[in-house]
Amino acid sequence: MVSRRTFLSGVAGSAVMPTLSFAQSPAGAPSASGKVALYANVGADLTHYDVDVATAELTKRQTVTLPGGVQYAWPHASHRYLYVISSNNAPGYVREPKTDHHLTALAIDPATGAIKMHGTPVRLPTRPLHVSLDIPSEHILVAFNNPAAVRVYRVNTDFTPGEEVQQGTIDPGIFAHQIRVTPDNRHAILVTRGNEGTPTKPEDPGALKVFDYRDGLLTNEVSIAPDGGKGFGPRHLDFHPTKPWMYVSIETQNKMYTYMMENGRPKPEIAFRAETLAEPTNIRARQAAGTVHVHPNGRFLYGANRAEETVDYQGKQVFKGGENSIVVYAINQSTGEPTPIQHIETQKLHPRTFHIDPSGRMLVAEHNLPVNVRDGDAVKEVPAGLSTFRIGDDGKLTFVRKYDIDVAGSTMFWMGMVPL
């Protein structure tokens, strides 16, 4: 009899296995067809777009409605399924009952990229914030922020989400924001951001929670938390595709940290610190470092800078100022150190997620909400939407076009690309 592991590994192996060059989802190596599908949400609606990498153009195709507001998604290694987490109690999307939170499988048409519901959604206990799969796509890992937690679900032989893998005692930290399995599939890292302090509440410490990982089980937890996690608010990480280097965006300090990997695990020492902002001494409003991606060729690193704080102007709330940009770093191929070489505005506000196509020639940034900005003495609205960029041989970005999207009181929260 064929075992579950053998069956799933065989199906995954029948397609091009993904490289590990993305923090949000593994776009993988370019497919034989060269086709790429992009998926982006507005609230509970997840829309499929065709992607023309050569022209950096997107064409809207079809929309599937999930049980709640989309929070995150991650593709199966075969590129034929997409696993989506959703919630009815999330920023920009609050619906009754607020206790509805789900993990849903979608089937991807390998010829067109069209998506459809696959099986019955699995109910989750609280709002999920991040989802990923292990390297052979045998398990789905879900991170929850409040209360912080991580759960692991088996992938059934029909590719629907299966039973939960029961864990031992885990310290999930404070405000878990991402869960990733390391490239060797032997460890898992839970990124816990903590919370910034306020005049009435002290800072909650952040940490990287590193586990041994085997067949869905998380064990032997070790916490990486410089200075006890104070002044350390990690948000997202990504791995270099071929070297033992890990990059972590530090949201609350607007930094990019580099960690060396040893025996598949990150060493606790910070190898390199880099700024994310073009003007780190000119903070006009709250800045937050965001998503981080290593280019598929391993030579460049990309990170998001986000700002959306508003102030009253003529009776309207308008953008207070700040950097909404992608920072590009050149990676020293001997040491792993990233050096900033470009900061480019994304043409909209709050680029929560961005993604690089599998060929490494195109980057797309997603922006959550419409925001008013001053235009001289007037006020105009900058809509939510998508911006596309061409990636040069030198790693630098060139803005190509933007797509305004009416979120109708909801929010865009996630987007990603999958090769077909």
Q: Predicted segment positions?
A:
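Short, solvent-exposed loop/turn segments at conserved positions within beta-propeller repeat blades
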Residues: 41-42, 93-100, 145-148, 198-206, ...
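Short loop/turn segments immediately following the C-termini of beta-strands
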Residues: 43, 87-89, 145, 193-194, ...
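Short loop/turn segments immediately following beta-strands, especially the blade-tip
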Residues: 50-55, 107-113, 154-160, 212-217, ...
